[in-house]
Amino acid sequence: MLFRSITDNMSVMLDCSSTALFIARRIKDRKNLTIITNSLEILIELKDAKNLKIFSSGGLLGEDSFALVGNQADRMISEFHVNASIISCKGFDIDKGFTDSHDMHASTKRVMLENCDTRVLAVDSSKFNHIAFNVVGTLSDIDVIVTDVKPPKEWAERFEKAKVECLYPADAEEAAK
């Protein structure tokens, strides 16, 4: 569902999450796609893709991760404007927003969301009702949530009120009935 919305000739930012790596693997056959990422894993995954233009953010190699972060990464990312930024998070709480465990990762994710037309949070249900240390943003900071299950009714109502589109697999809706 999310993969179909990433089409040829688009520009996309992907963060350093395992979710973004999964997405990168699914879209590397697109034509004339420009990808900007701070993930070393995504750079390695896409290095042989023939029809992609790939930009690395540069920056400081993050502790305990394959992410490039810090002021240099944020500054480079802020020099671009893309069709969509796709990020993930360590926790998502309907009241507190979406969070990350590292301050520099959170900063880079915020910069990605500031420099795009469509702001996408890709978050699996295991992150629901969890709060990590650093706030990345709230519902007002995203346009689309992509998840693996139909959200609880209260959450769906909050998404609708905030004008956030929620995408989940059709079979998740059937399972919720």
Predicted regions located by residue number:
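Short, small-residue-biased leader/transition segments that mark boundaries at the very start
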Residues: 1-2
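Short beta-strand scaffold positions
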Residues: 14-15, 37, 147
